[in-house]
């Protein structure tokens, strides 16, 4: 076999490997449903104006699994939004004043944002994780989002599966909270309500309630 033929064969093999490296991730994305949704410029503007970053990500790349989201309206949810929410087939998991926890799928995000009575919306988490929230904490969270004070620090009592340690503290800090005191598996922390979704992601936390 001549040197020229050998070089040509090696070049073709290298080209094939390069093409495979480029197209394999794209093919995998198609096979596993990792397809980015496209929106019109007005819809993109709505996502930037009314949705938090995690909710925008769900709208663009989410699948079909429902999740809980916080929605803040201009008017009282029970008195003024019940009929509209019913027509849109959205499930209200809880509500207080102008704020509601809705069960959404990614495809319902933009239609919700198009409602002129909606002020803002934020991703919260899988519905089953709401069971870790004390009812009074959930209502306080709704009240604070409605009043626009969700960024202010609040005291929370976190109950862990055991006494916890450095890894648990890193998760608490990553959610925007700081540890005030510890008593065995019970930690008193302080931070903004906007950090609750990240706290809920930790399987080490079994329950959350308002701090005394």
Task: Mark where each language-model region is.
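Autoinhibitory N-terminal propeptides
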Residues: 30-212
């Amino acid at each position: 076999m001549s040197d020229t033929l050998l070089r040509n064969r090696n070049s073709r093999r290298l080209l094939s490997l390069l093409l495979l490296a480029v197209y394999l991730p794209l093919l995998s994305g198609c096979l596993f449903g990792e397809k980015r949704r496209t929106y019109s410029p007005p819809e993109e503007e709505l996502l930037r104006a009314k949705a938090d970053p995690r909710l925008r990500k769900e709208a663009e790349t989410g699948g079909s699994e429902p999740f809980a989201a916080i929605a803040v309206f201009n008017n009282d949810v029970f008195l003024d939004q019940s009929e509209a929410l019913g027509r849109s087939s959205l499930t209200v998991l809880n509500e207080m004043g102008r704020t509601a926890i809705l069960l959404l799928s990614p495809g319902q995000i933009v239609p919700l944002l198009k409602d002129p009575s909606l002020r803002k919306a934020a991703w919260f988490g899988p519905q089953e994780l709401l069971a870790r929230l004390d009812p009074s904490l959930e209502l306080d969270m709704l009240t604070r989002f409605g009043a626009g004070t969700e960024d202010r620090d609040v005291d929370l009592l976190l109950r862990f599966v055991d006494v916890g340690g450095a890894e648990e503290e890193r998760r608490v800090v990553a959610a925007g909270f700081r540890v005030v005191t510890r008593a065995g598996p019970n930690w008193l922390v302080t931070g903004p309500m906007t950090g609750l979704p990240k706290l809920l992601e930790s399987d080490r936390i079994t329950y959350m309630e308002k701090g005394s």
